[in-house]
From Swiss-Prot:
Cross-referenced InterPro entries: Globin, Globin-like_sf, Globin/Proto, Hemoglobin_b, Hemoglobin_oxygen_transport
Keywords: Acetylation, Heme, Iron, Metal-binding, Oxygen transport, Phosphoprotein, S-nitrosylation, Transport
Protein name, per record: Hemoglobin subunit beta
Gene Ontology terms: cellular component: blood microparticle; haptoglobin-hemoglobin complex; hemoglobin complex
Example of a GO biological process term: hydrogen peroxide catabolic process
The organism's taxonomic lineage, starting at the top: Eukaryota, Metazoa, Chordata, Craniata, Vertebrata
Record function comment: Involved in oxygen transport from the lung to the various peripheral tissues.
Modification type N-acetylvaline: residues: 2
Family according to the record: Belongs to the globin family.
Record-listed S-nitrosocysteine modification sites: 94
The keyword Phosphoprotein is annotated on this UniProt entry: yes
Subunit relationships: Heterotetramer of two alpha chains and two beta chains.
Originating organism: Callimico goeldii
Length: 147
């Protein structure tokens, strides 16, 4: 559960309504794989990840980034039940994929940076603080199965 004020909820939903999920999803996942290269081990089937350019232009990275942000979008409509919303994904990432739950926090922080880059002055400190709460809540929900 994420506790947001009315102003914070409004800031999150207003900005999210302007997000191009295809573009931002691919960029966020790509940046995660470039900045934290050890995360690439979970994506060996994606083909060429040999350079930042290869990662950022990889169609499988872009497609999976879109899928990730689709799930994030779903979470935004269930802020009061993030653990329930992400229960199946938590189980998948824990039991089958064996993803280090710290990676969820890293991806959330990368997403905040990508949103700041895309929205510039519109990504105010208030908006950033609200998104930091949301990505922390999502990361916690995704890590829930690990506890």
């Amino acid at each position: 559960m994420v506790h947001l004020t009315g102003e914070e909820k409004s800031a999150v939903t207003t900005l999210w309504g302007k997000v191009n999920v295809d573009e931002v999803g691919g960029e966020a996942l790509g940046r995660l794989l470039v900045v934290y290269p050890w995360t690439q081990r979970f994506f060996e089937s994606f083909g060429d990840l040999s350079s930042p350019d290869a990662v950022m232009n990889n169609p499988k990275v872009k497609a999976h980034g879109k899928k990730v942000l689709g799930a994030f979008s779903d979470g935004l409509t269930h802020l009061d039940n993030l653990k329930g919303t992400f229960a199946q994904l938590s189980e998948l990432h824990c039991d089958k994929l064996h993803v280090d739950p710290e990676n969820f926090r890293l991806l959330g922080n990368v997403l905040v940076c990508v949103l700041a880059h895309h929205f510039g002055k519109e990504f105010t400190p208030t908006v950033q603080a609200a998104y930091q709460k949301v990505v922390a809540g999502v990361a916690n929900a995704l890590a829930h199965k690990y506890h």
